[in-house]
Amino acid sequence: MPLTLGNITYSNCFPVHAGLIDGAVAGGPAMVEGVPSYLNGLLERGEIDVSPSSSIEYARNAARYRIIPDLVIGSRGPVRSILFLGDRDPRDLANATVAMPSASATSVVLLKVLLRKRWGVAPRTFWFDQAREDPFARGADAALFIGDVALRPELYPERAVRFDLGQEWWDHTGLPFAFAVWQAAGGSDGELRTLHRQLLASRAYGLEHRSALAGKYAEHFGFPAAFLDAYWRDLSFVLDDAMTEGLRTFYRYAAEIGEIDAAPDLRWTERGEG
């Protein structure tokens, strides 16, 4: 059977998978689509072999996974698609209630890290469905919105205070942030080397043809082509040394606030040749 590869349905994943989706890279794996939390579950249960998966998922199940080198969905400053909204300064949320989107994993832990480490508070939280619910109507004092919902102001309530968590992390640590890394739960070493080579070629195609692809897929994602082009331009898709240091720092903070037992060692698949 061919490898199965998860594909996050948000537009932020597209540049890495563009060559596979657009047919420029042949012989790729079978693809399964979903939001990050859904793909995390499939990966954990062994129902898919590889996926761009929430970086916190690796930390929670590091014994099961290996990270595919060089690939990330990350930011070096503002990310645009991870927004924290409310009506007061975050430092005033100690006795407040914060709504967390059920579609998220890493972004929720990132917000908890920032609330504790940057703003010095630990408010109550509850889950909400960002596609269907107004969390402020349920009594939230602040709420986190992620993905393509966060990119569409008409889909979330207007609030007085707005923070981009990519920028907040950068300001707090001076490091990039890795929201998702490609993780392998199955597949032989040879299959994973081949997939690594295919993914690098797919990413190269996506970045080289970014503007043209933004025009071609604008209707699919529901954004103007110029907006999509700029959004992809500002994201980071290369897991370099600085991004890896940001990932390690995130894991250390997550352990310090009790979201994971300990910061895991990073285990990698082998690189494909070429």
Q: Residue spans of the language-model regions?
A:
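Short helix-initiation/N-cap motifs at beta->coil->alpha
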Residues: A30-G41, V121-A142
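Short loop->beta-strand "edge-of-pocket" segments that line small-molecule binding or catalytic clefts
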Residues: P2-T9, R91-S107, H196-S202
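Secondary-structure end/capping motifs
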Residues: S188-Y253
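Short, polar/charged alpha-helical segment
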Residues: T9-G34
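Beta->alpha turn/N-cap motifs
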Residues: S11-N12, V35-P36, G46-R64, L71, ...
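A conserved helix-loop-strand patch within extracytoplasmic ligand-binding domains
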Residues: V72-R132, W169-W170
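Pocket-lining segment of extracytoplasmic ligand-binding domains
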Residues: W127-K216
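A bilobed periplasmic-binding-protein/Venus flytrap-type ligand-binding module shared by bacterial periplasmic
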Residues: G19, S81-R91, F177-E191
